[in-house]
Amino acid sequence: MTSRLQVIQGDITQLSVDAIVNAANASLMGGGGVDGAIHRAAGPALLDACKLIRQQQGECQTGHAVITPAGKLSAKAVIHTVGPVWRGGEHQEAELLEEAYRSCLLLAEANHFRSIAFPAISTGVYGYPRAQAAEVAVRTVSDFITRYALPEQVYFVCYDEETARLYARLLTQQGDDPA
């Protein structure tokens, strides 16, 4: 049986999946890193959708997620989540990161999405140590998919080879084949 969890090294904006997760900031207005890349690739329709969400509900809180159309991306939707800023690990960062992943998965499940692609949330300018963030991601997603049928396929999309190896090692340790 093929694992429901896979690691991909590459550009998340190029994937044809039901939902791409955006590691957003609270404003949802785009920024650096993967957030900026997703906004640039999706085009102005994504920014317009994010502006509408802000008008309706304000900023997106840490650990929460919202969904928008994907604009020019091959995905059906973009799920925007705000991960925690790393402040040394003593400020509920792990719990907030778990909540961010879980919020995305719940939106994917509610929208009947079969596939979802995650970047390494909070590991860029938010400073979350990659190894610790990867452990939270793999544990949270693995726990979720044991209880829910959807999404059927979850991709951890890593920008660099070192991060991809880290995720692959964690999946192998828990008995999943990451390829």
Swiss-Prot record:
Keywords: Hydrolase. Its EC number is 3.1.1.106. Homodimer. Interacts with RNase III. SMART domains: A1pp. It holds the Pfam family Macro. HAMAP family: YmdB. Gene3D superfamilies: Leucine Aminopeptidase, subunit E, domain 1 (3.40.220.10). InterPro entries: Macro_dom, Macro_dom-like, O-Ac-ADP-ribose_deAcase. Residues 1-175 form the Macro domain. Belongs to the MacroD-type family. YmdB subfamily. It is an enzyme of class 3 (hydrolase). SUPFAM superfamilies: Macro domain-like (SSF52949). It catalyses: 3''-O-acetyl-ADP-D-ribose + H2O = ADP-D-ribose + acetate + H(+); 2''-O-acetyl-ADP-D-ribose + H2O = ADP-D-ribose + acetate + H(+). GO terms for molecular function: O-acetyl-ADP-ribose deacetylase activity; purine nucleoside binding; ribonuclease inhibitor activity. Deacetylates O-acetyl-ADP ribose to yield ADP-ribose and free acetate. Down-regulates ribonuclease 3 (RNase III) activity. Acts by interacting directly with the region of the ribonuclease that is required for dimerization/activation. NCBIfam families: PRK00431.1-1 (NF001660), PRK00431.1-6 (NF001664). It comes from Salmonella gallinarum (strain 287/91 / NCTC 13346). This is O-acetyl-ADP-ribose deacetylase. Substrate binds at D11, I12, N25, G33, V34, D35, S122, T123, G124, V125, Y126. The active site is at D35 (proton acceptor). GO terms for biological process: purine nucleoside metabolic process.
